[in-house]
Structures are given as C-alpha cells and as structure tokens.
C-alpha cells in the first residue's frame, strides 16, 4: 500500500540523516580530542578538485548551479592526508549544494603563489548572510534561515579543523550574499 511505502521512505531518509549526524559527531569528537591519525603524502590539489567536481556534477545540475573551475596547468602539490583533505572538499561542496542560490555560478579556483597553494570556492547564498564569518565554523551553528535544510551544523567546523590539523589555514569571507571560503597549504617540495 502507498501509505506504508511513504512511511518506509521517510524512515529511510531519517535513518540516513541520523547515520550522517552520528558520523559527523564521531569525526568532530576525534578531531577535538586529537584522536585522529593522519597519513601525510604529497597530493595534487588539481586532481582532487577535478575528482570532487565529478562527484558533485549531478548534485550541482540538480540545483541548477553552474560550476566555473579554474585550475593551473601545472600540478599544485600539497602535503596532506588524502582521506581528510577529501572530507574537507566534500564538506565544502555539500555546503555549496545546500546553500547556494539556484541558477547561479559557483567559482572554484586553485593557485600557487609565494610557496603557497590556495583553493577558493565562491557562491551566492540563497539566504541572507547576516552573521559573522567565524560563527559558521563553530559547532552546531547554522544561519537561522538555513534550519529548514538538512545538516548537522558540523560541516564547516569539521572542514576547518581538518584543514588546520593538516597545517593549512581556513578562512571564510562574507560580503552581502557572497560566500567565499579559502583553504591554503604550503606547497609540497
């Protein structure tokens, strides 16, 4: 019967959400306690970004987001843990999917400058950004209007803490409805 199928679908969605929240809480707890093992290696940030772009292409299309990605032709090598840097990028892209205004562009660019590798992601927010940038990386903090979307309020906090654990810097800039996040690492030698 249709009603039973709807209940099962809702239960499945809620259990998936609970599973994700639990994983986020465990990850946040490990990070804050320092109980996380990092395996550093040289990674090409260009390749990672291209992989994440591929993973999120369908989701971006579903939100009618036009991805403009500008990467340098030469490899942009950083020293990081591949699983953890993937999680950083995944959290940033999930954030774009949830909060970017549909029908707008998302800009992703990576550059090498003065021995540093910098990745920036910019988008126009669907909701007003009437709070301080540093509030967004506090645990469980979400803009009031965003409460209608799924999320734990941990995504940007986890992304920032994982970036810092890997000796990178993580900065958020807000300007009107423009949201920009920049992560920076030393260039690997």
Task: Give the predicted meaning of each segment.
Residues 103-115:
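Short beta-strand/loop element within the Bergerat-fold HATPase_c
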Residues 96-97:
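Short helix-loop "hinge" at the ATP-lid/N-box region of the Bergerat-fold HATPase_c
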Residues 13-18:
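Short alpha-helical segment of the dimerization/phosphotransfer core of two-component systems
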Residues 128-141:
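Short conserved segment of the HATPase_c
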Residues 39-43, 61, 66-76:
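Conserved catalytic submotifs in the C-terminal HATPase_c
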Residues 33-38, 77-80:
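Conserved micro-motifs of the catalytic ATP-binding
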Residues 167-168:
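Conserved glycine-rich
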């Amino acid at each position: 019967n249709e009603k039973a199928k709807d209940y099962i679908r809702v239960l499945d969605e809620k259990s998936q959400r609970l599973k994700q929240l639990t994983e986020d809480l465990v990850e946040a707890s490990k990070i804050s306690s320092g109980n996380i093992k990092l395996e550093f290696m040289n990674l090409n940030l260009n390749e990672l970004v291209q992989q994440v772009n591929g993973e999120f292409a369908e989701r971006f299309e579903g939100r009618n987001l036009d991805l403009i990605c500008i990467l340098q032709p030469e490899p942009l090598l950083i020293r990081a843990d591949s699983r953890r840097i993937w999680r950083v990028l995944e959290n940033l892209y999930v954030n774009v999917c949830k909060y970017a205004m549909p029908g707008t562009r998302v800009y992703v660019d990576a550059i090498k400058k003065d021995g540093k590798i910098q990745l920036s992601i910019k988008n126009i927010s669907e909701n007003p950004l009437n709070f301080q940038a540093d509030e967004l990386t506090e645990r469980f903090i979400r803009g009031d209007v965003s409460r209608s979307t799924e999320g734990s309020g941990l995504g940007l906090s986890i992304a920032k803490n994982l970036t810092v654990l890997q000796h990178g810097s993580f900065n958020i800039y807000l300007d009107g409805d423009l949201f920009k996040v920049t992560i920076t690492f030393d260039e690997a030698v």
